[in-house]
Amino acid sequence: MARKNVIIALLIFLVAGQTLTAQRGGGGQGAQAAAPATPDVPIVGLAGVAFRVSDLTKARAYYQGVLGLAEAFSTKDQSGRVGSVYFKINDEQYVELVPDMKPGELRRQARVMFQSSDLKKLHAIYTERGLAPTPITTGPDGNPVFRLLGPSGAKLDFIEYVPGSQQGQLRGKLLDSRRISTHLWHVGIYTEDRAASAPFYGEKLGLPRGRDVGRGEYIETPNSDSNTETKYPKLDPNNPATRAQFERESMGAVEHMALEVTDMKATRDLVQDRGKYTDLWVRAHVGNNRHWLMHLFDPDGSRAEIMETAIQPDSIPSLSVMLPGKAVGPPILPKEPRVIPWP
């Protein structure tokens, strides 16, 4: 039944049409030193996001080879098997890969991590608000952590970095110049009923606007997303032969991360060369949020939304496409409402 509800929520929007843009968000690379989101909740910002993968070798080629994120450390279970691998974005933020994805599985996001400046205080606040945080324990990375289950089964972990932890030992290290981005700007968390979940993220977690987490970072809570437009050939949601694949690709677009960049064209050209991608796979367009956007996908379909810091002028309307290829020129402007003009 739960899977059926997930699929229904995804298809309500997807079949009706395309919304090829992210929600508008604030902040940027220059905003990372900002104060916590709200004074009475000691949340500093996003600590990272974990994606499930089916093949670590292929995943490494993407996260390290294409995105340029240095492999920082790994954790192992009691049997000695790799439990997760961390890739470093900056001293405060990591992407974690969990190698347990099975063929045909729908959900890829393993957890979303929030950084706290006072984990014990945060735990007490959430307990007083009627939430059910797990006890604070020491995670495999050496940091204290507790978990809350959010709407639609979202796994939300709250951590506090401490000296001697894996992240603490790597502070100031592995800041690879090959990184396409030095800032995780936002994370998309699948939420079946956005209206019903709003009080949880706003009133219970204490996030301003139900999304802001500090340092200019934020969460999105979509129940559908059609940002699969760089996957060709496009899949027909009404075709029984490809319906399951369509659902998986749609969920991979929903459960996403957004990386901030300062120069979209330079970034697009770089990842195209690294990944040997076609022009279609690195198409960049202006979103409704007025930022240049590009959507990349890991080998298991999890989306990385690449978003330029600058807001574009009105002369470059939403859905305008950056001129493909290495040539420099004006963008391709849309001719029809809600239709990307290229290809």
Spell out what each predicted region is.
Residues 41-94, 128, 141-147, 188-236, ...:
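Core segments of cupin and vicinal oxygen chelate
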